Amino acid sequence: MARFLLTLIAATVALVAMVGIEIVLALKREYLATEPALEIGGTFGSASDPPLTFAVLGDSTAAGVGVSRAEHAYATLLAERLAAEGRHVRLLAFGISGARIGDVLREQVPEAIEAEPDLVFVGISANDVIHFTSLDDVRADSSDMVERLRTTGATVVVAGAPDMRAAAWHEPLRSLAGWRGRSVAAAVEEGARAAGATTVPLAERTGPFFARDPEEAYGCDDFHPGAGGYRAWADAIYPELEKALAR
């Protein structure tokens, strides 16, 4: 028994050390620059169609980090699809690289409310995964965020963290990040639904594609989505926007 316990302790220490090394390497890794930011926004569709003000809030992905042209950002792709269904869409993108849910609540939500949007999409919480925001805070901030946005009468759709098993990371960090990401995304969805938002299980819908074809899915840093990844995100998100608007 003593030998077994010593072996177990040694294995645990080795695992913790390995994870620690992977975290250090991940922090030192060079990711895509977030400046200068892409100019995402504008109008889409015919001016004779019914107007729809569409606000997108979130982190670096909402800001289009991972692609070099705004037309490949998921916010733009969603605006184009909404316009294709007979709407004159005004797209407002508030995403800021590095934002956590608390940042969106304090900084982006007030700006979005001033714009009086008809439809809001929030894609958030990858940075909450990385920075270990407590699940209670994630849940509470998600609920508060949706409640405030809905005071404008807007339809609100929310997606939590994507599949966090990024190609940029090695095992066992990759699996641990995936587990943590699922927990955070579930907390986001729980809080958002409680406040009346529609939610998108982004990791579930897009994770298999990112795992199957990382070269097509990721940008050159193997962390942020590239053009193919953002198309997959738009494919996952857009049906929920239409369903929410139809309610």
What spans do the regions from the language model cover?
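N-terminal secretory targeting modules
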Residues: 1-55, 85, 115, 211, ...
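Conserved SGNH/GDSL esterase-like catalytic core that processes O-acyl groups on lipids
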Residues: 26-33, 53-55, 61-140
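Residue-level recognition of beta-strand->loop/alpha-helix junctions
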Residues: 93-95, 160, 201-204
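Generic structural signal for well-ordered alpha-helices
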Residues: 109, 142-146, 185
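Alpha/beta-hydrolase-fold catalytic nucleophile elbow
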Residues: 123, 159-160
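A short helix->loop->beta-strand "cap" motif at the edges of active sites that frequently abuts
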Residues: 152-155
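Catalytic His-Asp segment of secreted/periplasmic serine-dependent ester chemistry enzymes
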Residues: 164-247
